[in-house]
């Protein structure tokens, strides 16, 4: 969910997200790879990320898993007790995976890619932006070529 929330901030195109209000929540959650657990150094807007010690990375991963397990167990218990899904979903953590459809024009897609595939973008959303760029290159090769030739800046 945390990547989707960053994505939705672009306010371009239209989004249709899977709703835990009407369907059972998934039991899939984001656990970063050990090398993706990092510390933030510096001030907001002007910071960098540094790797953490392997022990801290593993501890972080274990704690995330424990929180996810507890939250999903609570969610299921509430639903089984008759609590409406729209209320039970409130216990779901930001690391829960979500699904959505995105309808977007080429110009807005290029803008998204130029911002979110940059080295300064959050690593997790950068991976999705890179996938969007591959899609752009496959479906609109001439447009993608012009995008790259123009310094990866949307017109």
Which residues does each PLM region occupy?
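Family-specific signature for flavin-dependent thymidylate synthase
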Residues: 1-155
């Amino acid at each position: 969910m945390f990547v989707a929330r960053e994505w939705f901030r672009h306010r371009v195109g239209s989004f249709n997200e899977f709703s835990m209000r009407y369907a059972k929540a998934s039991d899939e959650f984001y656990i970063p790879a050990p090398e993706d657990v990092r510390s933030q150094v510096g001030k907001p807007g002007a910071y960098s990320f540094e790797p953490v010690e392997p022990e801290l990375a593993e501890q972080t991963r274990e704690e995330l898993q424990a929180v996810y397990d507890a939250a999903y167990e609570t969610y299921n218990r509430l639903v089984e007790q008759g609590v409406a899904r729209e209320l039970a979903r409130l216990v779901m953590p930001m690391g829960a995976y979500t699904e959505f459809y995105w309808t977007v024009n080429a110009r807005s897609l290029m803008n998204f890619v130029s911002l979110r595939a940059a080295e300064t973008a959050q690593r997790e959303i950068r991976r999705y932006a890179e996938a969007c760029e591959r899609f752009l290159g496959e479906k609109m090769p001439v447009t993608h070529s012009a995008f790259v030739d123009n310094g990866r800046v949307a017109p």
